[in-house]
Amino acid sequence: MYEFKITKLATGEESIIFGYDMTNAFRRAKLNPAEWVVWDREYID
């Protein structure tokens, strides 16, 4: 599983989401990927 550090384009809000890939992480967090920038990805067990 991966940890993705993301920032919302409109507000600068930072968040962390988790998933098996980027699509899965956004789906699990119920976020629109078009509104966010992923700036770091780290593999976690």
Kindly give the residue locations of the regions a language model identified.
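Short aromatic-glycine-(Arg/Gly/Cys) micro-motifs in beta-strand/loop hairpins
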Residues: 1-13
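Short, mixed-charge low-complexity intrinsically disordered segments
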Residues: 30-45
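A short, exposed loop/beta-hairpin motif centered on an aromatic-Gly-Thr core
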Residues: 11-21
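Amphipathic alpha-helical interaction segments
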Residues: 10-12, 28, 44
